[in-house]
């Protein structure tokens, strides 16, 4: 498993726990807004949890246009 795959898998696990959905229902290419039916405030709440988990802080400009788990994992991996 590559570092990106590990990070993506961990993000998917965190999202599933946070929104109480089965992990199997989520995949790397999913648009989290559509797949989880969440709004931007809920996405920020999830992002805060993810940042705390990975001990990083992602600037807003790095998150513009990010809506799928794989791209989010790539941004996070670039900070680790």
What are these regions (language model features)?
Residues 42:
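Two-component histidine kinase catalytic core, primarily the HATPase_c
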Residues 2-38, 47, 52-80:
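Phosphopantetheine-dependent thiolation modules in NRPS/PKS and related acyl-activating systems
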């Amino acid at each position: 498993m590559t570092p990106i795959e590990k990070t993506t898998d961990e993000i998917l696990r965190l999202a599933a726990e946070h929104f109480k959905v089965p992990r199997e229902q989520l995949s790397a290419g999913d648009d989290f807004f559509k797949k989880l039916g969440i709004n931007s405030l809920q996405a920020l709440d999830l992002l805060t949890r993810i940042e705390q988990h990975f001990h990083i802080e992602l600037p807003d400009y790095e998150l513009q246009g990010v809506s799928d788990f794989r791209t989010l994992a790539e941004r996070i991996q670039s900070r680790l």
